[in-house]
Amino acid sequence: PEQAKVLQGTGLLASDMMLLMAKSTEVDYVLFYMKSSPLTLGYHALERMIQVAEQTGAAMVYADHYSVEDGKTQKHPVIDYQLGSIRDDFDFGSVVLLNGKMLRKYAEEHQSEHYKYAGWYDLRLFLSRQGSIFHLNEYLYTEEEDDLRASGEKQFDYVNPRNREVQIEMEQAATRHLAAIGALVDTERYAQPDFTKDDFPVEASVIIPVYNREKTVKDAVVSALSQVTDFPFNVIVVDNHSTDKTTEILNSLATDDRLVHLIPSGTDLGIGGCWNYAINDEHCGRFAVQLDSDDLYSSERTLQTIVNAFHEQKAAMIVGSYRMCDFDLNTLPPGLISHSEWTENNGCNNALRINGLGAPRAFFTPLARQVQFPNTSYGEDYAM
C-alpha cells in the first residue's frame, strides 16, 4: 500500500528499530507487533484498544489473546502489569498499542545506549515511567505461536550461556530503569548478620519439603544424610500429607537420628508454608539449606562448602550452582547453571529482572524466621 513504509534496522527489538519507529510517526497511537508469524486482529480490536488508551491515558495497552499451537487454538490470558514487573520476559503478548507522544519522547530523550537485544525492553521500561501500562482483559487477536518449547525449557533461557550477551544488555537496561525510579539498591550498604547471637541444636539443617515423590525422595534424603562435615547437622523433611509411598519410605529411614520427619497438622500449606514449618521448628539449625525432593547433592562435601561460604562471605543467603540432569544423571541442556547473572556489585538489582535464583539456596535461619516464606507453591523461594 502507498501508506506503508518499511523500516530497516539491525533487529526487530533493537534500539535502532525503536528509534526509527518513534521518529517515523506523528500519529496518536502506534500498534506494534513483535513477531513475524501470521496475526489476526479480532473484530474492532484496534478500535477497542484505542478507546481504552484514550480513556485511561495509558502509555501502553496490551490484551489477552488466542494462540495457535500445533493447529489448536487456545486462550492465552496475560496478567496485570505492576510497578515491580520488570522481568524482561514479562508476557504482554505480541501486540501492544503505544502512546505516540510518549514514544516520540523516548526518541527525544534517548541517550547513548544502543542495544542490539534490549531495545524493546528499554522502551517499555521508559514508557512505564511516563504513564500506566494497562492490561485490557479481553481476547482481541489470534497469533501463531512460534516458540513451541515447553515452559519448563523456556524458564532457563536467562541462564543459558549462549544467551549471555543478551543478558548483559538486559541487566544494563534494568539497572538504568531502577536508578531512574529511585529503586536501585546500594550494594555498599549491606548489613552483616551476627552468626553468634543465638543458640541452635545443630549448625545446619537440610530442608526437604515433599509431596508424593516416592520415586526420588529416598535418594534425596540419603544424599543429604551422606554429607561429610566438621559440624553437626540434621535433615528436616516436611511431608505434606503424601498419598503415595513417600511417608512409608521416610519411616523406613527413621533409624538415623539426624532425620526429622515432620507432618503438618493442617492441610493448607504450600511449599512455602512447609518451609516455614521447618524453619520455625525447634530442630532447625543455624543455617537452613534447601534440597528439593527430586534433587541430589553433587558431592558429600556440598553442605560443608555452603556453610563455609556463609562464614567467609558474612552472607545471610547463599546460592550455589547446579546441573540439570535426567533420572540416569545424564546432563540436560543448558547443563551447569552457574548463576553468572549474580555479581557482587549488582546482583541484588539484577535479581529483580531474572526468573529466580535456582538451587541450592541456603538461608541464615533467624533472618528466614523474621521474613517468612509466602504460603505458595510457585515462586516462594524467589520471593524470599
Please place each PLM-identified region on the residue numbering.
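A conserved acidic beta->alpha catalytic loop
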Residues: 1-2, 38-39, 239-248, 267
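Short, acidic, metal-binding catalytic loop of nucleotide-sugar glycosyltransferases
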Residues: 1-2, 222-232
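Glycine-rich, basic loop-to-helix element that forms the pyrophosphate-binding segment
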Residues: 9-25, 265-283
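Short beta-strand-to-loop acidic/aromatic patch adjacent to the donor-nucleotide binding site
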Residues: 26-40, 285-296
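Conserved donor NDP-sugar-binding/catalytic core segment of glycosyltransferases
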Residues: 38, 43-75, 301-334
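A recurrent flexible, glycine/aromatic-enriched loop bordering the glycosyltransferase active site
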Residues: 74-98, 340-362
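Acidic donor-binding loop at a coil-to-helix junction in glycosyltransferase catalytic cores
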Residues: 114-123, 378-384
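A conserved hydrophobic helix/loop-capping motif in glycosyltransferases and polysaccharide synthases
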Residues: 204-216, 220, 227-228, 238-239, ...
